[in-house]
Regions:
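Sec-dependent N-terminal signal peptides of Gram-positive bacterial secreted proteins and lipoproteins
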Residues: 2-24
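Bacterial lipoprotein signal-peptidase II cleavage site
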Residues: 17-41
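Short, well-ordered beta-strand elements
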Residues: 42-54, 72-78, 145-146
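Short helix-initiation/N-cap motifs at beta->coil->alpha
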Residues: 76-87, 175-202
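Ligand-binding "clamshell"
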Residues: 107-119, 133-134, 206, 211, ...
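A conserved helix-loop-strand patch within extracytoplasmic ligand-binding domains
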Residues: 119-168, 267
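A bilobed periplasmic-binding-protein/Venus flytrap-type ligand-binding module shared by bacterial periplasmic
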Residues: 126-137, 239-251
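Periplasmic-binding protein-like
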Residues: 154-163, 261-281
């Protein structure tokens, strides 16, 4: 009897020991799973890009799923001005920006002392002349008022477009930073309202004509290919670029975005979505 009781006690002890070991194994497996999950989360890289709403942010949205497949979370932050996106990249608040053309970038670096570089040419937005109170270029009266951007490069760009239409003559037709002071012939005595580029669509009803960047025209519901009275030629030097701070050109996430922006899928999207108002530059 004592032998049977001893055998029973030994059996119970063995079962409890095995159960305890089994519980420890399960806990360890759960811990391993949590650690693996943590490792997966740590592998996700966030890339922030400052962009104008249209077309830049619209184009970037198409890159989100492409980068997600590579473990990159593309965060697009929209800005409506031409200064903060650059200072944000310079200060490290944004990883990159996509809103500007090369002449503007070069002028910004020179005047602001920033260290920004372009890493990808993406598209061209032909600048256009739009009707305000005057319906056509032929009807433009003496002393008419024309709204133009007030930043150095886009102002020069607007004046070059007006010169191409025979409305004015500049002292140097290759001067990309021309101002009204560079006008040497103004047969219609045109007056120029120099305004922040983003605000120009809102003053169309108050001026005779307005020269508007295509991104702001699109944002205001205007189609550059059908609504503009005149538009830049396709050989425009104003290519819009992806920009980072100097030293970050080879960042893996940045290079992944460059590859996505230069893909056939993005080229086809730009061509189909904007119908000539935005032209791929790659």
């Amino acid at each position: 009897m004592k032998k049977k009781l001893l055998a029973l006690l030994l059996g119970l002890t063995l079962c409890l020991s095995l159960a305890a070991c089994g519980g420890s194994t399960d806990d360890t497996a759960a811990d391993d799973t949590a650690d693996t999950s943590g490792d997966d989360a740590a592998e996700t890289v966030t890339l922030t890009v400052a962009a104008s709403p249209t077309p830049h942010a619209v184009i970037l949205e198409q890159c989100v799923p492409i980068l997600a497949e590579q473990g990159i979370d593309l965060v697009i932050n929209e800005y409506s001005d031409y200064v903060v996106p650059n200072t944000a990249v310079e200060d490290g608040d944004e990883d990159a920006n996509y809103f500007q053309h090369i002449p503007y970038l070069e002028e910004f670096n020179e005047t602001r002392g920033t260290h920004l570089v372009d890493v990808a040419s993406v598209h061209i937005e032909p600048m256009g002349i739009y009707a305000g109170k005057t319906a056509s270029l032929e009807e433009l009266a003496d002393g008419a008022v024309i709204a133009i951007p007030n930043d150095a490069t886009n102002e020069g760009r607007a004046l070059l477009l007006l010169e191409a239409q025979g409305l004015i003559t500049l002292d140097d037709s290759s001067n990309l930073t021309a101002t009204p002071n560079n006008i040497v012939d103004n047969p219609k005595n045109l007056e120029f309202q120099e305004l922040e580029a983003a605000t120009i669509p809102s003053v169309l009803a108050d001026v005779d004509l307005a020269v508007i960047n295509s991104n702001y025209a699109l944002g205001a519901g205007l189609n550059p290919t059908t609504d503009a009275l005149a538009i830049e030629s396709s050989d425009s030097p104003y290519v819009n670029v992806l920009v980072v701070k100097e030293g970050n050109e080879d960042n893996e996430a940045v290079q992944a975005l460059v590859e996505a922006l230069h893909s056939d899928a993005i080229r086809d999207f730009i061509t189909e979505e904007f119908d000539g108002a935005v032209v791929p530059a790659f």
